[in-house]
């Protein structure tokens, strides 16, 4: 059946059931496919509702940690180390040797995680306000960070000799956090972007034409540390970009199934997207394109995951699928991912964005130059996101040994101090009728890190609600000790109730306030109770 006509007109439940039965035993999954209310089609997935725990949580920490953190040279090391002339290639040759002799598999071998204390880290994250932890399961490098059944190049067999994902899951849940995984090894990103460079060679220099180690086979490992392991299972069979990859797609699906079945994640995050393109000649019916590699791959994963999650939680759906580049026709089927970007308006459905205080993989240069993003950026970022019905997943990148550096510890401590005072206005809240007021509300299409360009002041206000209580965050401290909230003017349409009490969270004394025709005027103490964003609790009469 034509996908366009299906999406436009829908199908009867009988037809859907027949199609679900036909695909239910798809070659992509092994064993019994969980039955449930969700069928592997976008139309069926429209009945999804985001669970309340995710809407309440607001903030999570992302353990974006893999062998690529070992060189401490930032993100995409597993690709750029094979690109002659790149900064990471030059570092690699100087530090480890030429990639024909010392390749990415050898970087994986160096990952020991010898100073990793997951329980201590999770306690730090929880103190900083995290309600969930997301572990990187597989990056574009094609290395699995768990005891993978379908990839021998994994963290139990190579490197740390530990189940990284499983350990994070156990420790997070023991500390009362929800747990999720992020999966980046999709066909589009891994097969097309990361693996093909491993089969190339230098174009100039003394080793020009000598193939990189991506061309090695199991027979080349005799007498070496990786003897008996086939490097082509890590690097893929030699191929060029845009080469069909049915075997890799099959393995991708089995690995996703494995991580779902093994750890029952509360969040399933993909560093990829599901995008529609409207090329039907103007009729408005979508021609489905799924970036994960083949059409209809994403809905098969989602139906499997949602139904499995319902079984795990005794009939309740507690799972969240997080995808980027999602266009409007399927917004309600999942949780939209805005990676490093902000929504510029209040969103009807819950959403999430990811941000990082440094590079996605650890960078020694950023630490040594004290160049991390500061709490002065990330705290207003969190408040802005929550006011628009979103969540923030924040990465604090770990070095390969697993111990955060001193600047990261200082960041977490400052965030924890702020959360101790202000989390009441964040956790468990819902958006108000409007998300905010002030000059920064007019900024459109902003990238998260660009917030540092804007100097927030006390006229930049963000709102959240919890029950009858309204919270108003001022993103700056007033020089004249007065905050004016125009949206709460006595004549404003948004808040018609009488105000009984106004409190400044963390303040040692009560604040004075008056509600006037031009706004709610609050006189604040000389010294702020915290830094970066200041929360007023407004209770109705």
Question: What are the residue ranges of the model-derived segments?
Answer:
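N-terminal export signals
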Residues: 5-25
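Mature catalytic domains of secreted/periplasmic carbohydrate-active enzymes
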Residues: 23-541
